[in-house]
Amino acid sequence: GKYTMDESSIAYMDGDKLFQRHAAIVGSTGSGKSFCVACVVEQMAKLKHSNAILFDIHGEYSSTDFKIDGIKQYKIATPGDLATSEKLNNNILMVPYWLLNYEEMQALLLDRSDQNAPNQAMIFSREVLAEKEKGVEGTIYEHLITVDSPVAYDLQTVLTRLKSKDEEMVPGARAGSEKLGPYNGKLTRFNQRLENKLSDKRMGFMFSLQTEEKSQNWLKDFARVLMKADGGVKVIDMSEVPSDVLPLVIGLLARIVFTVQQWSSMEHRHPIALLCDEAHLYVQQSISQDAVAEIGLKSFERIAKEGRKYGVGLVIISQRPSEVNRTVLSQCNNFISLRLTNVDDQNVIKRLLPDNLGNIADNLSLLDIAEAIIVGDATLLPSRVKINEPSIKPSSQTVPFWSIWGKDNSDQDLSEAICNMIKQSK
């Protein structure tokens, strides 16, 4: 971009320091935040071995403009994609249930208020581990895996065993008599929740697996798609993922990236950045009793604290920084702050900025569209900058209400919208 005080001077940021120390791009809706993200992505895409993942929550970075060299478009499978073969080759991503660790499966399936929850968690983990061990018999992984190991297994078989235990009768004290088994009736509600998940078409990307997603080799191909060194910027369209499991799904993807980096040898580790659009939806400050959001947050807290050691950079993008987790925000050493109109949001950013900025931070509500205050290790001095308009434009531009209302013909295809709403897919 260019400095607001001197438009003849070009403002630069140090790319190494920007991603090494994590960054935050914040701004109220309509402030030019999406343009700023597009500008960063455009510059990254020009690098020969750029490596980043952009979690696109609303599908605004999946427009035609973003289909250029250095940017690859993916989407989480919708109900209409489940029958597609070779999904990875068609840029369709499944997130199989067998990637979930013990805590994530509990958050998704277990009702903490159920008095039988401890028994349900114990027997479920035991059956899952038994099924995983069965799958690695005779391989190099035999006797080495845990319930958290990402090993493919058949969840339907686990459900069948749980149903059997829920109805089990065992020999009684008297000869020929029977009594209720130790888990009889205690797994009923858990089994019902699991059956509901398996039959929920919205969750098909996780539970409706074909043969290819049930193969152990699938994980290697999946990791290559997400993390290969010449992969460029991978935009993952998350717009059709159910909102109630969005934190879990994104947290799982982030955890996989971090874990693969952690287990890679240093000489073969290629740095990768995670760009978290609308981060306040899944890197939340206030979680209350939401187990799914809580477990998803853990991945980002760990990346914020330890990601630098393993070459994982984090870019938090949000219109409501006051709703973003403080632990994660406090680890960001670079801030690109566009106009913020909410007082709470302004105060959060002001508290995170250095004390010696003078009154520059007082201008957060006065900034023009696509104008930002940039502070941090990636810039020599705190600066007020007008961000260049990117050549690739997101589909989030402000809708011209008055102009559209004044047109002669502006019909909306409501039939198509209703059809998409019913089938939960565009």
Region annotations inferred by a language model:
Residues H49-I53, D230-V233, R269-A273, Y310-V315:
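Loop/turn-to-beta-strand initiation segments
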Residues K75-G80, V95, L99, F335-D344:
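Conserved AAA+ ATPase "SRH/arginine-finger" region at the nucleotide-binding site
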Residues K17-L18, Q43-K48, L226-K228, W263-H268, ...:
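Conserved catalytic network of the ASCE P-loop NTPase/AAA+ motor domain
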Residues I369-K426:
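Conserved P-loop NTPase motor module
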Residues G59-T64, N90, M94-S299:
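P-loop NTPase motor domains
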